[in-house]
Structures are given as C-alpha cells and as structure tokens.
Amino acid sequence: MVVGVLTGALVLGALPIIEYSFKVATDATLFELTDFNHPLLRRMQVEAPGTYHHSLMVANLAENAALSVGANPTMCRACSLFHDIGKMAQPDYFTENQGEFGNPHNRQNPSMSALIIKSHIKEGIEMAREHALPQVIRHVVRQHHGTTLVKYFYHQAKQRFKQDTLSYGEPDRDQPDESTYRYDGPKPRFKESAIIFFADSVEAAARSLPKVSHHSVEELLENIFKDRLEDGQLDECPLTLEEVAKIKQSFIKTTLNMLHSRIEYPEDENELTPSTVRGNKGDSKQKAS
C-alpha cells in the first residue's frame, strides 16, 4: 500500500521533468490547460472577448473532429483555446473584437493591415513562451494559418494599384507582392495542427453566414477545404484524404449544432400555426443580427 502511494507520487513528481526533457506534453498537462482560470484565458475574456468566444468554438470543432480520425482530442482542445492568444496585443484589429468604435484598418494601407494581422502569430509564440506553455501549443500557434494568403487586404492592394494605373497611368506604388500578404508558416505538420488549421477557418466563415442550413454549411466547408488543399497547405501533414473527408463531415455536424438557433427551417403549413411561424421568423432575425 505504502509502496504504491510512493510510486504514484514519484511518477507524478517526475512528469514535469520528463515533459521538459523530451519537450512533450502529457494529456494530464494538456487537460489542466483547458481550465478557463488560466491567466491567459482570463485575460483574453476581458481584452479580446470575441477572440475568446471564437477560440471556444474552434475547440469544440477540433475536439469532435479529432475523435472522428483517431487524433488526440485533449491536445486539440487545449491548443485551440490558446491558438489566437497573440491577438491580445492588438485586439481591435480583428473583426470579432470590433464594436461601435469602428474598424482601425480603415486608417491603414493594405500592406500595413496585413502585417498587423500576421503579427498575431509572432505575438502568440512570445506569450506562449512567457507563460511556459507546452511546445505543442507553440507549434499550433505557429502553424494554424500555414502559409495562407490574407486575401482581403491582398485584393484591396491589387484594386488600389489598378485604380492608380487607370487614373494616373504611372501608379505611385509598386504592384502588390503576394508573398507580403502570406503568413510565414510553416504549414501544418501533424494531424492535430491541421485539424485546428481548418477549424479556425471554418468557425470564422460560418459566423458570417447570412442564412444557416445544411446546404449552406456544407457548401461553405467544401469551398474552404478545396481552397486549402489546392493551395498546398496539407503538403507537409500526414493526414490522408479519407481523414480529411471525415474531419469535414464532423465540422458540418458540429457547426450545425453550434448555429442551431440560427437555422432557417422550411415552413410546413400543416405543422406550424401562424403565431409559431411569426415567432420563428422573428427569433431567427434577432439571432442573426
């Protein structure tokens, strides 16, 4: 009895040393990091509440998808909660945190806006290091955008260049370089990182859907996955196409569950009374606004 207790105590005491020496995080450590009382998560709730909510939704998507392909759900949940901590450096520059004070990007040129958006990766890695978060979380922070293009500001820059060319013949700015508007990477290199990479894009896009239905969600995810695959974002990841398909189906199910209150159901006159129909329509408009 005493030997068993001592052995257990020794194992628990040795875990931090093992994790530090081999740069691995056990499920026990990762599970502890899902506690919302972690200083970084508490800070995010106050300084970047939109990002905090986004991270919770990404965690739900990633955890369920991990279960569907035999990846580590605890790792996915923990890493998802911290993947966007770098946004706390300049929270107002990210859509989910912008309120009545407007969009600060309106005062920036596209290249500067892209630089600010991309900087949340570097800021996040630094915060993770300062708070001694496991190496795997730092990997996810670094990889969760891969080398994707910050499309909005790239297209904005191209449009401005085109307008200058039409107006002045000789534009006073260089033609936009696509590499300036791409994240530095690396691309996702392990299954859990790739799952969070997709979950991050899916949650942000689904939040903006004007109408929520099985068809609209499925079409949205199909476009996101197709775009990322054609862009070569999974070239360094061991995920198979079969696993990618399972992840996509898991995302569809989880997204529909998360957005359930916004789903517009077809009206069946035989089942719905006029008052019920009016109530459902009003609720759906209120939720979507």
Model features per residue range: what roles?
Residues 1-49:
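Generic detector of multi-pass transmembrane helix bundles and their immediately adjacent loops
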Residues 272-274:
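Cytosol/matrix-facing juxtamembrane amphipathic
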Residues 41-214, 218, 223, 227-231:
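Divalent metal-dependent catalytic cores for phosphoryl transfer on phosphate-bearing substrates
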Residues 276-289:
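Long, low-complexity, intrinsically disordered segments
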Residues 69, 231-235, 260-264:
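Active-site phosphate-binding and catalytic loops of NTP-dependent enzymes
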Residues 1-6, 131, 251-263:
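C-terminal domain-closing interface element
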Residues 265, 269-270:
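C-terminal amphipathic alpha-helical interaction region
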Residues 231-256:
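Cytosolic regulatory/linker segments at or just downstream of nucleotide-handling modules
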